[in-house]
């Protein structure tokens, strides 16, 4: 898959699970695939039993996750995803990609503005964006090629963009099964 340009994040919604244990489980099962580029944590679901919308990730937690991930592949990264910057590690940056999954933004310009703030907040670290939610379909539904059109707008506006992810919820709207 990697030779075809497909790259895969092993992402979890950890709830109460121990994240280092999940890193081990995921890498032992899937880490041998050459398309795997890292491990991801959807922070909205990190210790949601303790804090609504997930517990903020501490610097120590982020550093431990990166070390655990890199114990399998030295070049792999850790993706941390949320729409609130305050849920991200306050200062640790090495080996992290910060992904914003905001939705319900109403227009492409509002999306670019929202995501630009995220990019600036975490610059020069790499950032990514998850988009294509049904709540934004009124803005992307009329585009000729929504993943490309939105992606190009984000890359043009946010120089530290590394990852662009279309959500699975509307993937068949864009790429219908044959």
Question: Model segments located where?
Answer:
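An active-site-proximal structural segment forming one wall of the substrate-binding cleft
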Residues: 1-4, 15-38, 68
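Aromatic-lined carbohydrate-recognition surfaces of secreted/lumenal glycan-active proteins
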Residues: 4-20, 66-88, 101, 126-136
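Alpha-helix N-cap and loop-to-helix initiation/capping positions
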Residues: 17-18, 53-61, 110, 146
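Substrate-binding cleft/loops of secretory-pathway carbohydrate-active enzymes
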Residues: 22-28, 84-111
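A general structural detector for well-ordered alpha-helical segments in enzyme core domains, enriched
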Residues: 22-29, 58-65, 69, 114-118, ...
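Active-site groove signature of glycoside hydrolases
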Residues: 27-56
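Substrate-binding cleft of secreted/luminal carbohydrate-active enzymes
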Residues: 103-178
